[in-house]
Amino acid sequence: MAEEFITPVYCTGVSAQVQKQRAKELGLGRHENAIKYLGQDYEQLRVHCLQRGALFRDEAFPPVPQSLGFKELGPNSSKTYGIKWKRPTELFSNPQFIVDGATRTDICQGALGDCWLLAAIASLTLNDTLLHRVVPHGQSFQDGYAGIFHFQLWQFGEWVDVVVDDLLPTKDGKLVFVHSAQGNEFWSALLEKAYAKVNGSYEALSGGSTSEGFEDFTGGVTEWYELRKAPSDLYNIILKALERGSLLGCSIDISSILDMEAVTFKKLVKGHAYSVTGAKQVNYQGQMVNLIRMRNPWGEVEWTGAWSDGSSEWNGVDPYMREQLRVKMEDGEFWMSFRDFMREFTRLEICNLTPDALKSQRFRNWNTTLYEGTWRRGSTAGGCRNYPATFWVNPQFKIRLEETDDPDPDDYGGRESGCSFLLALMQKHRRRERRFGRDMETIGFAVYEVPPELMGQPAVHLKRDFFLSNASRARSEQFINLREVSTRFRLPPGEYVVVPSTFEPNKEGDFVLRFFSEKSAGTQELDDQVQANLPDEQVLSEEEIDENFKSLFRQLAGEDMEISVKELRTILNRIISKHKDLRTTGFSLESCRSMVNLMDRDGNGKLGLVEFNILWNRIRNYLSIFRKFDLDKSGSMSAYEMRMAIEFAGFKLNKKLYELIITRYSEPDLAVDFDNFVCCLVRLETMFRFFKTLDTDLDGVVTFDLFKWLQLTMFA
C-alpha cells in the first residue's frame, strides 16, 4: 500500500477558544463523547485510507526527528543516530495489536526515561474495563488495517480521542522505546506514541510521577502517602484501593542525580517508578504475613530479599496458595513483605477513580467540580503568601460547606464533626512546552475562612487588606514542581476561599482546579462584576469655562481654535516634561490620536474648547491618582499598583479585562508609565460613559448593527 498524507485542519487562537466553549456546551469532552484531538476523526481517516488503498501517515505527529525530541533526543543527538521509523508490518510477518488480552508483561521499558508512564500502563492492565476505555476494542493489523490506530486520554478535564499512525522508532530492526515481551505485540508501543503526540514529543515523556499517567488514563485524582509518616492502616487502604480498581504506584527517592536508577543491594531501583499490582495476606508458619506485589517496568531486575521469586519463605506457604500467587522468575514482577516495602520505598501514589473515600469503611461517591484558570504576568500571577503585595491578585474560588460527614462507625467520639473534601490543582501543558525551555512550575494553594461580615455575599474578589490581616485556615501540604498537587481536608461547615498560585509571582501558566466533596457543597469562581462608579461629568458651555483656561486654549489651539492630534501631543509632552518625578517617554502620536478619537464628539478629528476642557480635567485627576499609587515613588506604577489605581478611579473590572489592560499598556518589565496610564483611563472612562448613554433601558445590554460596531472599534 502507498502512504496517504492527510493534513489536519483545526482552529487556533480566539476561534479555537470559541469552538472549545461551544463544544463543552454540547457535552463534548465526556468519555462517551470524546473530543477528536486536533480535529482528526479516526473512522473517517481509516475509511479514507482504505478507499484509496493507502496507509495512513500522521502529519500532525510525523515520523521525523522533531517528534523524537528536542535535546537529548533532538535532531542532532547521537542517541537518535540510526533510528528509522517502521511499521509493525515491516518488522513482523504477523504483527498483533493485542495477544491473549493485555497483561502487565506487555510493557517493557526501552531507551526512554518514562518508567512512570509504563508503571501506570501496567496498572491499567489489571482492570479490563479501564484498559479498554483507553485502548478501544476493534483494532488490529488484519481486518480493516490502514496503518491508523486511536486511543482515548483524559487531558485536563476532558477526554480526547487521539489518532496515530503505526510508524514507530526502531534501531537495528527493534523498537527503541516501549515494547512487549511478546515481540510481535504493539498496543503498548502505539499507546506510548499517542501519549507522546499529545505532549509534543517522545522526549517530553522523560521523567515524571506515576500519578500523571494514572490520571490521564482514568480522569481520577491521586493522593500521595509519604511512607515514613504513613497512617497505621495503610495496608488496609491499599487492599481497599486494589479491590475497587484504583491504580497504585510507588518509588524510592534519590538524594542526588548520581542515585538516579541506581540499583540497591537487594535489586531495587532508586528514582524509578514501580506499579503496585497486588496485595495478599498469607499464612506463614502459623502467622499471617502481609505481602505486596510490585512490578518493575523494565521487565527485569527484581527484589532479591524476603519473599522474592524463589526465596525460601515460599516453602513455608501452602502450595495451592503459592500457585495462586503465580511466583515466576525474572518477569519484572515480584512479592515482598509489607514491612520491607515500608522500609525500602519512600512514596506511594493511589489514584482514586471515583474518587472514593479510602479512609471510610464503605464506598462513597464524591461530588466533583472542575474549574479552569490562568496565571498571567502582571494581572493574575501573584505568587504565594510570601508575596503579600501581589498574592491577592491570584484567581480565587469559594467553597460553601454545609453538610457534615456521616458518622464513622469506628470513631468513638474522638473527632469533631466536619466536612471532608479534596482539592487538586493541576498545571496544564507543561510537558508540551519543554522544548521551549519551560518545565513544571512550583505550585500549591491556600484555603481561607470567609469572615462573618463577608459570608453570603455575591462573587467578590478578596483584596489585599483581607490577606494582610487573615491567616490561612489550611493549605496544600507543600508547594512542589509536579503537574498536580492534591490534599484532603476536613473543615467545619462554613464558607472558604481557595487561592491557587505558583510559588513565585509572575510565573505564567494555565491550570485546572478540581474540588471533590463527600456531601453536596456550593462552589463558585470569585471575580468582580464589571462596573464603573463615575461621578456625573460636568460639561460646561463655552461661556461657563474659566477665562484663564480660554486664554490658554487660544494660545495652544492657534487660529482654527481646535487642537489636532499633533498639537495635543506637543501640549501633553510639554506639560509632563515639567514633572521630573514621572517616568515616561512621552505621549506617542498613536496614543494622542486615540484620545482625540475618543473625546471628539463632532467627528472632525480635532478637539474644541469644551472637548479639551473635559480631557484636561480628566488628566489632572489621573495625575493625582497616579502619584497616590506609585507607592515606591519610582515614577511609574507596577502592574499590581495599576490594578489598585484603576479601582480607586471608580472601575471594577474582572480578571480577563485586567489581563488585556496589562498586555496593552505595560512595558516588558510590567511597569506602567504615566502616558500609558492616562491612555488606559481615558479609554475606560469614555467607553463606560458611551455605553451608559446607549443603554437607555438600563438592562446592561446594548445592540449594535455592523456599521455602528465598526464605527466604534475603528475610532477606539
From Swiss-Prot:
GO terms for molecular function: calcium ion binding; calcium-dependent cysteine-type endopeptidase activity; peptidase activity. Residues 545-715 are annotated as: Domain IV. The modification Phosphothreonine is found at T354. Residues 543-578, 587-620, 617-652, 682-716 form the EF-hand domain. GO terms for cellular component: cytoplasm; cytosol; plasma membrane. The active site is at C115, H272, N296. InterPro entries: C2_III, Calpain_cysteine_protease, Calpain_domain_III, Calpain_III, Calpain_III_sf, EF-hand-dom_pair, EF_Hand_1_Ca_BS, EF_hand_dom. Keywords: Autocatalytic cleavage, Calcium, Cell membrane, Cytoplasm, Hydrolase, Membrane, Metal-binding, Phosphoprotein, Protease, Repeat, Thiol protease. Residues 355-528 are annotated as: Domain III. It is found in: Cytoplasm; Cell membrane. Ca(2+) 2 binds at D318, E323. Its cofactor is Ca(2+). Disulfide bonds: none annotated. Residues 529-544 are annotated as: Linker. Its main location: cytoplasm. Its EC number is 3.4.22.52. Pfam families: Calpain_III, EF-hand_8, Peptidase_C2. One of its GO terms (biological process) is proteolysis. Ca(2+) 3 binds at D600, D602, N604, K606, E611. Undergoes calcium-induced successive autoproteolytic cleavages that generate a membrane-bound 78 kDa active form and an intracellular 75 kDa active form. Calpastatin reduces with high efficiency the transition from 78 kDa to 75 kDa calpain forms. The keyword Nucleus does not apply. It catalyses: Broad endopeptidase specificity. Forms a heterodimer with a small (regulatory) subunit CAPNS1. Belongs to the peptidase C2 family. Calcium-regulated non-lysosomal thiol-protease which catalyzes limited proteolysis of substrates involved in cytoskeletal remodeling and signal transduction. Proteolytically cleaves CTBP1. Cleaves and activates caspase-7 (CASP7). This is Calpain-1 catalytic subunit.
